[in-house]
């Protein structure tokens, strides 16, 4: 390491070079996390329901988690989204427009015992899914 009177530039450049050894720094600066994200860095996204799917829970749990396969409007990518709530999947039909957000797993991954599912449905045809489940609102007829 340089210690002289005019060493500042060398020290600065060394720090700059060393930062690239950090994986998270490199991914952030090059925008790779946003590029790989189906929502493109946005907090929520809209999509069209392609089909309803049942995802089997991981061990030691035994259940079929009700999910929907959707195609995002903004970029055409297909993702699987979990439908939270008792009987929530019954309010969602094919070709409905749903709003999804991240499910909240660590490092942007899946949550709990639902493998490979990183999103959850929060609204169907611009009506809150939670309100539909508790019976406070009705789904609008198209």
Swiss-Prot record:
Give start-end of the signal peptide: none
Lineage: superkingdom: Archaea
Q: Name one Pfam family in it.
A: Ribosom_S12_S23
Q: Which key words tag this protein in UniProt?
A: Ribonucleoprotein, Ribosomal protein, RNA-binding, rRNA-binding
Single GO molecular function: structural constituent of ribosome
Gene3D superfamilies (alphabetical): Nucleic acid-binding proteins
Name the PROSITE patterns for this protein.
RIBOSOMAL_S12
Q: What cellular-component terms does GO give this entry?
A: small ribosomal subunit
Its BP terms in the Gene Ontology are:
translation
Membership in a protein family: Belongs to the universal ribosomal protein uS12 family.
PANTHER family assigned to the protein according to its UniProt record, in alphabetical order:
30S RIBOSOMAL PROTEIN S12 FAMILY MEMBER (PTHR11652)
Q: How does it assemble?
A: Part of the 30S ribosomal subunit.
Q: What does this protein do?
A: With S4 and S5 plays an important role in translational accuracy. Located at the interface of the 30S and 50S subunits.
Q: What is this protein called?
A: Small ribosomal subunit protein uS12
Naturally occurring in which organism (per UniProt): Methanosarcina mazei (strain ATCC BAA-159 / DSM 3647 / Goe1 / Go1 / JCM 11833 / OCM 88) (Methanosarcina frisia)
